[in-house]
Amino acid sequence: MRAEIITIGDELLIGQVVDTNSAWMAERLNEEGISLHQITSVHDDRAHILTALDEAFSRADIVFTTGGLGPTKDDITKHVMCEYFGTQLIEDPQVRTHIHELYKDRPEALNRLTATQWMVPQTATILTNRVGSAPIMVFKKSDTGAAFSSPSGRPLNSSEASTKHLIALPGVPHEMKIAMIEQVLPYLATTSEADLQRSDLLSTAQRSIIHRTILVSGIPESKLAILIEEWENALPSSIHLAYLPKDGIIRLRLSSYGDTTEQEIDAHIATLLPIISDYLLATEDLSLETIVGCLLKQRGMTIATAESCTGGRLAAVLNSQSGSSSYYIGSVIAYDNSVKTNILGVLPETLNTDGAVSESTVRQMAEGVRTLLHTDYAIATSGIAGPTGGTIDKPVGTVWIAWATPEGTEAECFHFGAAREREQITHRAVTEALVRLVKRLNNIVSIQ
């Protein structure tokens, strides 16, 4: 099943808003076996939207649109849809009731503009947007077998018309996500295969999509490719390997588009693991914080953090997981040296001699917070995130990280590069802190 996304809104094309919707939708659609072939962004402009719809329907079986469903004059998507599908707006009593209920505690939000939200295209199937006023609209061929209208004048044959769907979604990210999860994906799952599939689509076996992801760190991408070259060359043509490096972690994603079974792709992975064992983080596509949380809970152990240059970012990542209170005890944000000495017990002479950004300082920070909060593990960070503060000996991007464990304390210096922005440096520091922690806990993770 081929799909395309059209994102609608001037704000996307002037850089005011980043399109996060498409990335999220692409991942969800892929999980459902729906192949996304193209993403297009257009202005809030009638002609642009009509052209984008016509082009998308020439290629795809399902077209998703996001944005332009609000009540203001610049929100024209609903009106353009009416023109495209040859229909008109009518009042929907259920949508009206929903909107009144939505705003029952905010009566000032019910006005003549809000009232336009319960006007919907007559031929559309309407799905409820539980958290917003813009209903989800689904367009397809009519019960009479009428084909889609085409603004370019190109007739759509009956085979095309019987399979094409357009699903118009709100552009507000949290509304779109809830709409997809609660309404759109269940709708697609229950809509008949005959209604969704054209005769020229791929067979069921060919439509099967299987993904497996392996997390690797501590090796450059090029070196990894050389290491597994022989294994990669032996993969069947139905399995595609992608290298996806980001923030010091390489995701090896194996994708099967065909009749390869899960057992077959898992068998290939089993032969890969011994080759990359020195660099293996996890055998599933999990976040570092998920892996850390799982390992600590499995072992009944706890952790604390002492942060200088990362300023609480490490703490925020660790406690972002549900149930993290069972293993994450707390943090000391020791940005000023007085906090390092008075709370964490870093020796003043250490700071005077070696400086705040040094191996000895982060070791004492990690040991200090581990003792203070009575945890099994502790991580400490201290560095120069920039853009100022660097020296010849300690340039911007220099970060020391220490790990205090039941077996002792280790520290490592990282150079993330002076050209990176401050946020990038602190983000990399958090990533490396967790990567090294995972390897100390257990270098292979698979969550069942």
Where are the predicted features?
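Conserved hydrophobic helix-helix packing surfaces used for dimerization/oligomerization
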Residues: A3-I5, L166, I303
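Glycine-rich oxoanion-binding loops at beta->alpha junctions
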Residues: A26, N30-E55, E91-G132, V339-D376
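Glycine-rich phosphate/diphosphate-binding loop of Rossmann-like nucleotide-binding domains
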Residues: R2-I39
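Short alpha-helical segments enriched in small residues
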Residues: E262-Q448
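An accessory alpha-helical subdomain
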Residues: K164-H268
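Proline/glycine-rich low-complexity loops and linkers
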Residues: H48, S58, D75-S203
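Flexible gly/pro-rich beta->alpha loop and the following alpha-helix that scaffold active-site loops
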Residues: T66-E91, L272, I276-T283
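Glycine-rich beta-strand-to-loop/alpha-helix junction loops that act as flexible
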Residues: I8-D10, T65-K73, P170-G171, Y257-G258, ...
